[in-house]
Amino acid sequence: MLPLMTHRDSPDPRRRQLLRVGLASTALVLPGLGPGLRAGHAGNGVDAFDLDWHDARRDRPVPVRVYLPARTHEPLPLVLFSHGIGGSRHGYRYLGEHFAAEGFASLHIQHVGSDRSLWAAGSPLSLVARLQTAAQASEAIARVHDLRFALDAVLAGPLGARLDPQRVVAAGHSYGANTALLAAGARVVREGRVLDLREPRLRAVILLSAPPFYGEPALPPILGGVDIPSLHVTTTDDVIRIPGYHSAVDDRVAVYQAIGGPRKLLAVFEGGSHAIFTDRASPGGPWLNARIKTATRELATAFLHGTLAGDDAALRAWPQRHAERIARLEAVGVPGLVVLPG
């Protein structure tokens, strides 16, 4: 069984419905961009596009949302974002809009076998069983194929001319971090064979609350072969709670310690929770929630600028800006960064 697990995009179904209505009311079809592409202005110089793709080979829908800078003529680096279990393409908006405002395209993939439909399908009494089914190896593998299909589709489609295929990054939260790890080169053995799902076009990976590989006796054989830069972000109270899949912050640290690559960074925030990295404003309380989100998105873009453009100035300055919230900061391959051992 491959890992698992996060929280839904929003705790309130009425809030999710209002969001859907609001997006639908502002959407328009852009001429020249092809069928299935709908757009709305997200503010702050950012445009957001919904695309409803279908992978014919697997007969599986792959809905996505793309965040782009509203005005740019340069080819954009691309972030492929994978949501946690029970999420959707509309989640992690705070990251998508920030990436776009900083000059990146951010493509948020919805994984239909482990998306928000889990919360509404069937009886509440069977919810745990549905979550456990969504965490099985077949869905974990399908998620990586979703990511690869989305990358192929966006590069081959009308938006491809605006993107730089040499600067592609995978990112994800919880189950989505597991998806990103598998795409980055994590190798697990199932039924006597190695599952090598590596996507060679990835230049780096961003992991929010990465779970362990459940049932595996050791992480180094799985993660030691990852050879691209990685950013790991968690909190001291980052705990996954689901029957059969309990995981705390020590597991996030173990993933960081086991992973290979020439450059890696671990940031552990004081306080917070597993759900604080979603769009929800309540986990940790409004004050802490807002500050951890701000620190996370600034760290992510600083890491990307350093990794993709070779400029670590923002990354070296980041700890001083957020020192009061950092419980632990470690790094390999980031010269001049002041670390804070936990």
Where are these regions (language model features)?
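Serine-hydrolase catalytic machinery in alpha/beta-hydrolase-like enzymes
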Residues: 57-163
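Alpha/beta-hydrolase-fold serine-hydrolase catalytic core, especially in secreted/extracellular enzymes
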Residues: 271-273, 278-342
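N-terminal secretory signal peptides
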Residues: 1-13, 24-27
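Active-site rim elements
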Residues: 133-138, 216-219, 284-294
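The feature captures the conserved acid-bearing segment of alpha/beta-hydrolase catalytic domains
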Residues: 194-267
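Glycine-rich His-Gly loop
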Residues: 81-85, 174, 210, 235
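Primarily recognizes the serine-hydrolase "nucleophile elbow" in alpha/beta-hydrolase
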Residues: 152-220
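A domain-start/cap signature at the N-terminus of enzymes
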Residues: 36-68, 202, 334-337
